[in-house]
Amino acid sequence: MKLAVYGKGGIGKSTTSCNISIALARRGKKVLQIGCDPKHDSTFTLTGFLIPTIIDTLQSKDYHYEDVWPEDVIYQGYGGVDCVEAGGPPAGAGCGGYVVGETVKLLKELNAFYEYDVILFDVLGDVVCGGFAAPLNYADYCIIVTDNGFDALFAANRIVASVREKARTHPLRVAGLVGNRTDARDLIDKYVEVCPMPVLEVLPLIEDIRISRVKGQTLFEIAETQTAVSYVCDYFLNIADQLLSQPEGVVPNELGDRELFSLLSDFYLNPTSNSEKNANISGLEPDSLDFLIV
């Protein structure tokens, strides 16, 4: 199974990806996480340091693939999760999609690409071009990390559009949304009501998730000494269980930009209207209510 994790820049994709990878490993799967970001920091919380990138290694070998060995590019991280960083072209030059393609090509040359039960691609920020949508060419499922805010859901909607485009020629589906570090989910629920897709999990707004990234440790590793964090790991184990059940997934139809803007802004600008809609759905007339608290 191959997974591609997308979401708005800074939403917490790498932290989420690392913990999902460990959760899958805890379920007995052999897992490879591939960081697809020029910052090459996707696997930092698994390995504890910035590992050399595929591009750096290929450059040092003058792009002689036959001179590259698995141990040159694959590093084992916490929980037995193997880690690879694709890296990227210099700032302002080159194409990130090319780098992803070179990474997959090299792993195939090393007979490593098909040795894993699960390969997880952790992809940088919003989908801004076809190049950064390249991991979708290899994925069975796309996981979209969001929060309960407009910007993250706007980015999620653009990612949905990319999935729909790729699904024309690839057996690709959206596995679902993961809400990251949010106490509320009203906008998430509003979005999936209009653009139906599963919500795999909504992670609580706790500092331990943010701090784990700064520490360079996953929540599973922190939980070994801080048992109070253990309950958060259960969220990721639940995500892993859903993914391993090989869900049908969906190919949603994205909303138009203005339609999405109106949908989400109207939710707060016209709360009474939304309450009336909810009352009608439940079979109640708004006038029959004794009072309404907004």
Swiss-Prot record:
Amino acids binding Mg(2+): S14
Swiss-Prot/TrEMBL cofactor(s): [4Fe-4S] cluster
Signal recorded as keyword: no
This protein's UniProt keywords: 4Fe-4S, ATP-binding, Chlorophyll biosynthesis, Chloroplast, Iron, Iron-sulfur, Magnesium, Metal-binding, Nucleotide-binding, Oxidoreductase, Photosynthesis, Plastid
Pathway recorded for this protein: Porphyrin-containing compound metabolism; chlorophyll biosynthesis (light-independent)
GO CC annotation, single: chloroplast
InterPro entries registered for this protein in UniProt: NifH/chlL_CS (IPR030655), NifH/frxC (IPR000392), P-loop_NTPase (IPR027417), Protochlorophyllide_ATP-bd (IPR005971)
Binding residue positions for ATP: G10, I11, G12, K13, S14, T15, K39, N180, R181
Binding site for [4Fe-4S] cluster: C95, C129
Protein origin, superkingdom: Eukaryota
Enzyme class: oxidoreductase
Any one GO molecular function term: ATP binding
EC number: 1.3.7.7
Location(s) in or outside the cell: Plastid, Chloroplast
Cofactor remark from the record: Binds 1 [4Fe-4S] cluster per dimer.
Catalytic activity, as annotated: chlorophyllide a + oxidized 2[4Fe-4S]-[ferredoxin] + 2 ADP + 2 phosphate = protochlorophyllide a + reduced 2[4Fe-4S]-[ferredoxin] + 2 ATP + 2 H2O
BP GO annotations: light-independent chlorophyll biosynthetic process; photosynthesis, dark reaction
Family of this protein: Belongs to the NifH/BchL/ChlL family.
Function description: Component of the dark-operative protochlorophyllide reductase (DPOR) that uses Mg-ATP and reduced ferredoxin to reduce ring D of protochlorophyllide (Pchlide) to form chlorophyllide a (Chlide). This reaction is light-independent. The L component serves as a unique electron donor to the NB-component of the complex, and binds Mg-ATP.
Subunit (UniProt): Homodimer. Protochlorophyllide reductase is composed of three subunits; ChlL, ChlN and ChlB.
NCBIfam families to which the protein is assigned, alphabetical: DPOR_bchL (TIGR01281)
Name of the protein in question: Light-independent protochlorophyllide reductase iron-sulfur ATP-binding protein
Organism: Pleurastrum terricola (Filamentous green alga)
